[in-house]
Amino acid sequence: NMAIVDTDMHMTAPKGLTAASGIDAVTHALEAYASVMATDYTDGLAIQALKVIFKYLPRAYENGQTDVEAREKMANAATMAGMAFANAFLGVCHSMAHKLGAFHHLPHGIANALMIDEVLRFNAAEAPAKMGTFSQYDHPKTLRRYAEVAEALGLGGKTDKDKLENLIKAIDELKEKIGIKKTIKDYG
């Protein structure tokens, strides 16, 4: 099996599709990085995908078919995020987004975008009761993992909680740049 990543195939994608698929790739990378199944291999893919998406998604959104570089970088970043989650798996945001999107007729990426802030906060809570049966999950690590993402993106913060909030703020700013509304109600 193989996949061909061809920028020409999505050069004319409308802004809404660019925004929804781009923020979906953000969620893919974040959930793969925070997964208890994450590895050194998936971590590298997820972090690099996030760096590229934060840099190039606003350009791909604004410039559309005139910015070949931004479209190419986004195609590669989405593929990297996909490779990360294909091996580390996804989390509760994607699970809920499937239900939310189906019920409210929302694009999948938009459904993810509407929940990602609260899911990040929920996942980062140091609640040992949430621990699963995975041997690699002997204590809560998700807050630290999100802090590592914030560090990789150069978002600053003194504590891990500060870094988490800076990451959420950066995601919210990205969503605003690409025209994603803030609430389910905003989508009717």
Predicted feature locations:
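Flexible, glycine/charged-enriched surface loops at secondary-structure junctions
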Residues: 37-45, 60-73, 88-93, 131, ...
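Structural motif
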Residues: 2-3, 24, 82, 111-113
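C-terminal and late-domain segments of enzyme folds
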Residues: 16-80, 84
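Glycine-rich phosphate/pyrophosphate-binding beta-alpha loops
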Residues: 79-112
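Acidic-glycine-rich active-site phosphate/pyrophosphate-binding loop
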Residues: 2-3, 23-24, 54, 87-93
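Gly/Pro-rich interdomain helix-loop hinge
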Residues: 103-106, 110-188
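A glycine/threonine-rich phosphate-anchoring loop and its flanking beta-alpha core
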Residues: 1-38, 126, 141-148
